[in-house]
């Protein structure tokens, strides 16, 4: 496992889609300067070697034991990919595998901020939302001939409907993907948009 960080903003040249296909993009734009000073702010806790390395490498490694969840992932990803059809942003097998692995590996994290039990649908939708931002939206950039308002609206609709189908209406209110698409659409008025803030 190789873990590293790169600070990306509008002044930095973006990575190629080929590099982004092999990376997990985690956006950390909000800063709470008071957070973590009186107690640790760890929602997941300490992770051991098994959690970090895992046993699964491809979708096939988790599909059999988690068929229902993986089929939910595939239905969602098919809807998103329908919007991406004919663009350089369409996803393929590597992204499909990472979607399945990410969602399945998030299933144990079913406690809310107040230790309440979250439904599996909510946990799956939350993971789909996060990985959509990491693996799909991070690859989208271009001028208004490549990335149009209509394209971003269609993608927003597919994501919103997909998340609602998985968990119900409540998840889309907190959707990081939908918030990012709204931000990207706002940037498009200048004639160009990208994921990077």
Regions found by a protein language model. Give the residues of each.
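C-terminal regulatory/interaction module of P-loop NTP-utilizing enzymes
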Residues: 1-197
């Amino acid at each position: 496992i190789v873990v590293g960080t790169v600070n990306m903003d509008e002044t930095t040249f973006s990575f190629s889609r080929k590099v982004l296909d092999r990376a997990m993009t985690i956006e950390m734009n909000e800063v709470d300067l008071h957070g973590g000073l009186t107690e640790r702010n760890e929602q997941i806790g300490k992770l051991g070697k098994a959690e970090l390395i895992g046993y699964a490498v491809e979708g096939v490694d988790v599909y059999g034991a988690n068929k229902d969840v993986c089929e939910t992932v595939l239905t969602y990803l098919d809807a998103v990919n329908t919007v991406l059809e004919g663009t350089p942003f369409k996803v393929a097998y590597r992204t499909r595998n990472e979607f399945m692995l990410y969602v399945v590996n998030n299933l144990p994290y079913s406690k809310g901020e107040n230790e309440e039990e979250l439904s599996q649908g909510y946990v799956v939708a939350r993971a789909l939302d996060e990985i959509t931002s990491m693996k799909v939206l991070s690859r989208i950039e271009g001028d208004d001939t490549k990335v149009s308002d209509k394209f971003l609206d269609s993608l927003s609709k597919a994501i919103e409907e997909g998340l609602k189908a998985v968990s119900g209406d409540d998840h889309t209110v907190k959707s990081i993907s939908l918030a990012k698409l709204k931000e990207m659409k706002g940037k498009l008025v200048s004639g160009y948009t990208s994921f990077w803030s």
